[in-house]
Amino acid sequence: MLKKISIFFVAVMLAGCSSISDMTSYIPFMGKDKKVINLDKDKIDQKSYAAAYEATVATYKDRVNKNFFVDNFASGANDWYLGRIVVPIKQIQDKLYTGGHDSDVYAYYSGVLHAEALQTNFSRLSANCWQKVDSPSVTQGIYDAMRDLQQGKERGENDAYIFQGSEMLLKACTGQ
């Protein structure tokens, strides 16, 4: 009887251990290097990516260090663009600015606020500008910018890809 129980226990343990590696593809922040979003290069809309990257670098330069929760920040931005945030922005701002949050929670909601502000600014260029933007590419631009800032290797204003993409967005949204 003890032998049967032992064999059953070992079989369950082996099955459980083998499925843990499979779970990393379903659980956020496990497995891959880019844990939040990792679009293929051919799936990235240059104008959306570049504008988000440039705005994020301009906003967060000298504010991101190696301990900043970049994945949480990008997850907050991603959740905003996916429509997962049901709490009004004003309420998030009020709670965030009163303090008392753990760094990871603060980073997440900062990402939500950054994404909302970026979307609002796109809409200020023209009423239909946001419809011309690819939100996954925006999220990728935000995420890459935050990761680059964390490593001190952000792309500059003179980067051809970023410059051309930003110009493309201005033309698409303002017609100039």
Where are the regions a protein language model picked out?
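Intrinsic-disorder/low-complexity detector
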Residues: 18-176
